[in-house]
Amino acid sequence: MNDIQPKDSCQNPGGQEQIQPRVRRGITSVLAMMFLVIFGSLSVAMAIMAQGNLRAADSALHVSRASSAAQTGLVFGGRRLESEARRWVVKKGVIDNEFGSDLWSGNIAVDGSEVELLPPMGYETTSDPSGLMEALLDAHLADDHSFDAMPGDNLLPEIFNGRRLETKPIQLDQGDGNMYFRLSYELVEDLENETRVRITSTGEDRGITRRISMEFLVTKKIPFAVVSPNRIMIGKNVLVEGPLGTRFGMNPGELNEGNGDPIVMRSDFQYLDEELDEALAEFKELVMEYDVDGDGRLRPNHPEEGQALSGSGGLSDVDGDQYVTEFDLFLEAFDSNSDGRVIWDSERSEDAGISDVVVEFENIDNQLARLIDRAFADRNLDGVVDEMDTQLGYNDGVLDTYDMYAKVRGTLSFAVKESDWDTANGGPWRGVVEGPVLSETDEAPVIFEASEELLRDVTTGMFSNNQDWYRSQTDSTPDLTEQSDSNLGSDPDTEFIPSGSGEWESVPTGSPNPYDWIRRDVYRNMVFTDVLIPRGSNARFENCTFTGTTYVETTTECTHPNWNYLGALDRIEDSDGNVTYEDKFSGLEPAPNPDGSSDIQDTKSWSNNLLFDGCTFIGAIAGDRPAEYTHWRNKLQFTGPTRFYLDPDDADIQDQDDADQILGFINGFSQEQTDYFTRSMMMMPGWSVDVGNFQNEQAEEWESTPVVNLRGVIITGVLDARGTVDVYGTLLMTFRPVENTGPLFYGGSPDQFNTTLGYFGPDDGDLEGTNLDSSSFDGFGEIMLRYNPDSKLPDGIPWPITIEAIPLTYTEGAY
């Protein structure tokens, strides 16, 4: 029997068998299982990926937190280093590698003679640190948020190899020991003979670490364009790029309602238009009442300052810089086509690509216009003045918002209290301080009650040891007479005129209010090298070149109250026009001779009153340090196109006809000479120095007017600059007038002695100055003072250490 089951079939009409297809019902289950496997695998894969992503995200989070901790630590370490460095007040001018290494490691005497240590801020110690590294250790010991993250941290902070400080970890969240940073401070050897400290910050978050480092320069800088113990006067047509500081007003009798103001600033826009003068006067009243931060500007959107502008009539923000200043009033007065700018030079504007202009300020005050147009030369802050800066408004013949006008570009620092000044002045101090002050964004425009740590007096006595080196440079060279004879014998263009054959000159020369008269030896067209000008020379040098050290000798023991006046002369003219020169004073007690041999009846031959007209100095001028300020006798005047050069990269040198000769002299200096010259090109503490002319002498082609160029750190007792002057550096004044002593022995007030930039008259306290309302007054000149933050300093000035970050040394993962 066949047990094979027949297939389902049926007979068709032809009798043939037809096979029916079998239904396979299990395929659905198979497909379902396949999709189940696929989706299950995908789910597992997604779960694995999600878990991986979570782990990656968690790791990335910890990496980010560790990096943030490291960045925080680097900022913290930099600020701590800066804070502790400020405690160290040193007389050393340049912090070279040797001195910096000793200061860092503590191999230095902290006895107040060369190094002074100020108390710590925010914590106390039982003993003073021996050096900067130990001071950092003390500061970290006082931290509240340091803790022990791992074994061995309990031994920190600790100094290793006398060069490196390792600190305890510092947690970022109180009570959370998972996220923290630890710091390392290490002295770095540098090829440029600088002192650098490398801060390494290691951030950690739950076992993940990130390490970064950066180097910081240990240096010394005086962060002011002018530091003066006497009052500062900034006149019209004077711009300052840099902070100003004075401690005038702290002594009795200095503040008063007359001229006893720590600083006086005059508007640059006076004397241009009568209606503008009236508008400036009204604006000053508003500033005195509403200016809350002392910057001489009013903000339309400020809740208090804006009140001054709501009902002020024509006062508006013309240049669109969000402030109303004197510059807006100037634009309003001279912008004839209301385009928000004033064209003053069509040739400049065409060269800058500005066409179809209407000249609106032509030949009204070209020196002022050029001064504003060429201020803040590096407009894009790239370190180079080029066509890009011209596109941003530099020297383009247009005065507008791109010039970013400011009378002072920096902070004004005063030791006095604001209320004390206002009380003595009889009104707000802004009544005598005109013009806008534009400070850095993170700094206040005005600081009152500046501490001695921030703003220190510079005195004549600080430079007692500096003269020795400068004088030694003249020991082995021919004296003044020998060098003069050599010039006369080799160059027919040179000339010497003895004083007996010369003309009488007023002292100061050119002043409308002279206090003495003198006849001088005259030297013309000569070249002097490392020359000593002996006391009693009282000479005039015209178109002479001085290379190396020019040393001015005088009698230092000049404290007798009559030293200024012995031998002084008056010019007497009778009705017939005959002129004689007679004693100005009679019956004066003579001054004792320093050697005790006899009395001195005429101190001119014991002093030095010199005039340099159109001279060139390649190197430095220095002199003996007088024990008292005797401006009638110990005085230097620089007039005409006087030039000072030392930097071979100075762009101004290439514009000179004698550029090759200048560069030859500069390149011939030894490294030691260059080092001393760069610290101060004018080392004349205690002397009276006049720069420029008492009358604003302009050339027939006004742009060819000679400019007096001063470079570097300028150290004098009192300095007056007038006319056309360009200063790039820092002015350090040393004379502080005190009632009933020195030049005030017979009366007078301290406000009679000022550091003056620009033209002022006797009514302003400048007794030598010109009456600005007189018919003979011929314009305000053009003075630019630019602070050089890279200026080296001479030894002797006690000033705190400064720390500067060096961004290009930032490194991730190194060290």
Predicted regions and their residues:
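Long amphipathic alpha-helical repeat/alpha-solenoid cores
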Residues: 632-635, 641
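Repeat-unit-sized solenoid/scaffold elements
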Residues: 106-114, 160-166, 180, 191, ...
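Short, ordered "entry" segments at domain starts
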Residues: 60, 79, 184-587, 592-597, ...
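Beta-strand/loop motifs with alternating small/hydrophobic and polar/acidic residues, enriched
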Residues: 2-229, 248, 266-290, 296, ...
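Short, solvent-exposed secondary-structure capping/transition elements
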Residues: 82-86, 417, 631
